[in-house]
């Protein structure tokens, strides 16, 4: 877990130990429809990870795969690691019977937006809405 949390902190600039502890508790084991995949080099150094799950019937959407986290070490980008991770999670989604993959990306995150577009993802007919809550 520490290698994933460290990679995330190097890229995001934010330490999220409690978040990663929760993620590993929920997604670290093998459960149908939940995926936490990692890529390592020959020395067991973490190169990247991707995580997602099958979600069903959110606002009448049939079951689909959701990717909600991906990171690749900056030294390993453009080496196909992200593509390999994305293809692996898509293969996992196919094996459990879903045929659509979705994600949410910040408009400001051009790197991740470009990556997902390079994988064939595009805007869908669903729109994300949000509001700020008063304290």
Explain the meaning of each model-derived region.
Residues 1-4:
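A short beta-loop-alpha structural element at the N-terminal edge
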Residues 6, 10-62, 68, 132:
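Acetyl-CoA-dependent GNAT
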Residues 72, 78-91, 114-118:
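Conserved acetyl-CoA-binding loop-helix of GNAT-fold acetyltransferases
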Residues 77, 103-112, 130, 134:
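Conserved beta-strand-loop-alpha-helix junction that forms the acyl-donor binding cleft
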Residues 117-127:
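Conserved acetyl-CoA-binding loop of GNAT-fold acetyltransferases
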